Amino acid sequence: MPENPSSSPTEPPEQSAAFEKWRSGLAQFTGLGLSESEKAERERLKAQGKLAKDWDKCEGWKRDLMNYSPMITFLLNHLKLAGCPFPSSAMQCHPCPENRAGGFSPDHGILLCQDRFFNKKHMEDTLAHELVHAFDHCRFKVDWGNLRHHACSEIRAANLSGDCRFTREVKRGFYAFNKQHQACVKRRAILSVLANPACTSPEMAEKAVNEVWESCFTDTRPFDEIY
């Protein structure tokens, strides 16, 4: 019996499966033609892949800095000399909210915000900043609930880490040639103290920073001078 000309020939199963695989792959690549659940899964996998990529980069930079950065190796050595060796495991790479690059906790060590670094130099400055806090906590027994203590460590960390170098300030939109470094250190110290739960106002943060400014800005330990 002749075939009905209006009917379509049935595709072999393997050909149909190959087409579906191609269609699905194209949809995943472009995002077009996906169901809502498929779109959600696609975004989840993309985010998961980005997290893994950011973590790998952060860990790689951390290893490089611990081995080859004069600033970081110097601070790590002085932490060890002070009786507080700081292993790699105490410096953790994690994703963070915006406007944060790192942090120090006496209980948990150093946080490195893996998705917030512009480049390795930015990470070096951040790690140096947090290692100054670690050094202060070890060497001077900082009470982080005491705003004057906190202010002093923030002044020292901003002053010594490279966080306030001129090029960083230009990127932040601050342009001044007269005492720009001091202005940056004070501004950033006040912002950090303001985030302390014991601080209830910008005026309180500024007062704490001003009260310890002279002694803490000139205290460059463990460096002989500003790096």
Swiss-Prot record:
Pfam families: Peptidase_M76. GO terms for molecular function: metal ion binding; metalloendopeptidase activity. Keywords: Hydrolase, Membrane, Metal-binding, Metalloprotease, Mitochondrion, Mitochondrion inner membrane, Protease. Its EC number is 3.4.24.-. The keyword Transmembrane helix does not apply. It is a peripheral membrane protein. It comes from the Eukaryota. A divalent metal cation binds at residues 129, 133. Belongs to the peptidase M76 family. Has a dual role in the assembly of mitochondrial ATPase. Acts as a protease that removes N-terminal residues of mitochondrial ATPase CF(0) subunit 6 at the intermembrane space side. Also involved in the correct assembly of the membrane-embedded ATPase CF(0) particle, probably mediating association of subunit 6 with the subunit 9 ring. This is Mitochondrial inner membrane protease ATP23. It comes from Cryptococcus neoformans var. neoformans serotype D (strain JEC21 / ATCC MYA-565). The lineage of its organism: Eukaryota, Fungi, Dikarya, Basidiomycota, Agaricomycotina.
